């Protein structure tokens, strides 16, 4: 299977940008995860109505960029981790109680 985007390259570029901006200073993984949570809160604000706002996609991108930053900071091969997780999900048996 071919992937047109290298997630590790995106994570690297995000990490470089964070360093350049001075936003990558001795954060613990927990502190970094809490920034993901804050981005999730911002995304939730964009879907409070019946239809998501135009800014919803920006907030989703912010979540992904935060995750890329965490991956880069912690030496995680995020692309392989995502592929491994997707493959593991394929092994799950469907649960009729979950599908509504």
Model regions and ranges:
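Flexible "arm" and connector segments at domain edges
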Residues: 1-60, 64-100
């Amino acid at each position: 299977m071919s992937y047109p985007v290298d997630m590790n390259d995106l994570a690297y570029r995000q990490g470089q940008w964070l360093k350049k901006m001075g936003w990558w200073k001795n954060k613990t993984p927990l502190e970094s995860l809490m920034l993901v949570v804050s981005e999730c809160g911002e995304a939730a604000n964009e879907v409070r109505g019946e239809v998501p706002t135009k800014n919803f996609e920006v907030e989703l991108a912010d979540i992904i960029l935060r995750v890329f930053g965490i991956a880069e900071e912690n030496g995680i091969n995020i692309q392989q981790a995502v592929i491994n997780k997707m493959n593991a999900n394929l092994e799950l048996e469907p649960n009729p109680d979950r599908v509504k």
